[in-house]
Amino acid sequence: MDKPRKENEEEPQSAPKTDEERPPVEHSPEKQSLEEQSSEEQSSEEEFFPEELLPELLPEMLLSEERPPQEGLSRKDLFEGRPPMEQPPCGVGKHKLEEGSFKERLARSRPQFRGDIHGRNLSNEEMIQAADELEEMKRVRNKLMIMHWKAKRSRPYPI
């Protein structure tokens, strides 16, 4: 009788091991790379859309996707749908129509942009002097560019 008991005791030991006791099964390199990519994608999504902001951003994203297509609108309808511009784009507008040189217009516009100068208390004379320096630098630069252009093209062979 002692022998059957010993056999019974040995059988549970030879029984299949549980998940905890099994050595980890190694995945193929392809599966590992896929898992790494998916974890990288999740981390990048978390960086762009943290979980706290997702409930706030979701309605805006959904609204932006639900816009009806505007392909059927004519050019006239498109321009009527836009709000009027407050100021014309750069290079177009009233400053082209104003009379006077660049220096005079700069001196006149100084009070409007007093806050844009960031702590520099410049008088009108200083502003005009700075404008003169800028114009002189432009002239010198243009002369150098012309001289370079002429020197480059006056040779019988390219450099």
UniProtKB/Swiss-Prot annotation:
May be involved in transcriptional regulation. Modulates various viral and cellular promoters in a promoter context-dependent manner. Does not bind DNA directly. Residues 1-99 are annotated as: Disordered. It is found in: Nucleus. Residues 17-34, 64-80 have a biased composition (Basic and acidic residues). It comes from the Eukaryota. This is Transcription elongation factor A protein-like 1. The gene is TCEAL1. Residues 37-54 have a biased composition (Acidic residues). Keywords: Nucleus, Transcription, Transcription regulation. It comes from Macaca mulatta (Rhesus macaque). Belongs to the TFS-II family. TFA subfamily. Signal peptide: none annotated. One of its GO terms (cellular component) is nucleoplasm. InterPro entries: TF_A-like/BEX.
